[in-house]
UniProtKB/Swiss-Prot annotation:
Residue ranges crossing the lipid bilayer per the database entry: none
Name of this chain's protein: Serine hydroxymethyltransferase
Subcellular locations according to the entry: Cytoplasm
Cofactor needs: pyridoxal 5'-phosphate
Entry's Gene Ontology molecular function annotations: glycine hydroxymethyltransferase activity; pyridoxal phosphate binding
Keyword Membrane: no
Function recorded in the entry: Catalyzes the reversible interconversion of serine and glycine with tetrahydrofolate (THF) serving as the one-carbon carrier. This reaction serves as the major source of one-carbon groups required for the biosynthesis of purines, thymidylate, methionine, and other important biomolecules. Also exhibits THF-independent aldolase activity toward beta-hydroxyamino acids, producing glycine and aldehydes, via a retro-aldol mechanism.
Family recorded in the similarity comment: Belongs to the SHMT family.
Organism in which the protein naturally occurs: Rippkaea orientalis (strain PCC 8801 / RF-1) (Cyanothece sp. (strain PCC 8801))
Name of encoding gene: glyA
Modified positions (N6-(pyridoxal phosphate)lysine) in chain numbering: K231
Record's catalysed reaction(s): (6R)-5,10-methylene-5,6,7,8-tetrahydrofolate + glycine + H2O = (6S)-5,6,7,8-tetrahydrofolate + L-serine
Amino acid sequence: MPDNNLEILFQHDPAMAEIIQGELQRQRDHLELIASENFTSEAVLAAQGSVLTNKYAEGLPKKRYYGGCEYIDRAEQLAIDRAKELFGAAHANVQPHSGAQANFAVFLALLSPGDTIMGMDLSHGGHLTHGSPVNVSGKWFKVCHYGVNPDTERLDYDQIRELALKERPKLLICGYSAYPRIIEFDKFRAIADEIGAYLMADIAHIAGLVATGHHPSPISYCDVVTTTTHKTLRGPRGGLILTRDADLGKQFDKAVFPGTQGGPLEHVIAAKGVAFGEALKPQFKAYSGQVIANSRALAAQLMERGFKLVSGGTDNHLMLVDLRSIGMTGKEADRLVSEINITANKNTVPFDPESPFVTSGLRLGSPALTTRGMGESEFKEIGNIIADYLLSRGDEAVKHDCLGRVKSLCDRFPLYPGMKMAALV
């Protein structure tokens, strides 16, 4: 009898199994520095690959449109209860399929087409769903964007207030995809109160840090908080809506179903519940602290090697390297680090002269490799590996050396060591 899922899949669909096995090997052999990626536990994988995928369950626990939901109700309620405990929220909806779906449900609940929303410009570290013209949020609503201060490359709350007073948005959005500093939610609350706006925090990137107290929580300041459940939270890919207002919570529930989704993905919801349970344990708090320590170690090493970082460093899990300091584009740097089995992503920097397809920046993050057990000394070594190869501009001898150093780190900190590779037939 086969004793793991890959062996089962190889028996039934060897073509797909070989692809999945190849991806497992890629994850094992590469240093993952994409700030939005992480490695879930095998317990999360088990829940997501369970028989719960077979069940339709439109509605909410004990309010379903289908029969046979007694175990589904228990699984979803457990996930809800754990999410509320983890973040200190009065209400949680665990059904959004993604962070984008969670954000759109909030828009449906609070806004009408043509209303004004205000969020950070995508090129400064915002997100597509915060009013980018290529996203539905930028097509259905009037959008005004704020950015960072050109001198400090940090949020300028006085400038944000001035823009908010001028534009009077109905919804003010804070929370970002490429901002390496602490967000002061209390200052956003004061601005929202002054203009009578709803305040939404999208903490998709920092949710794990918020849950463990390593970043200030927005729950007591914001009308609604959205997040993904992967990234620093280390769960399955999915979304979550949180609020301290039970009445608003009912509106968000309706906006998710039937407003924007049909049947929830209960196997993913169960996996979210497992991840929330893991995040409630002391080990996860220690992990979150190490994520920040590792990020700062990598940032310090890169700056020591002469690289400029946006805002001069980091307070969280990510950093933005401004490659103009070495005369390189983000596209080129992304290609070069991939040649030595390091995975990152090109990224715009504030006031970037390059297009989004080229960029002047490289975004790096610490969550995934921290999950593998690496600490500050390993992240300093990673900083040196990146610096050595980028500064060499792809020299073959340096490439050979860097590949060996990357392999050494991957071998010392194995990924999913208990997960067997299936025999190719």
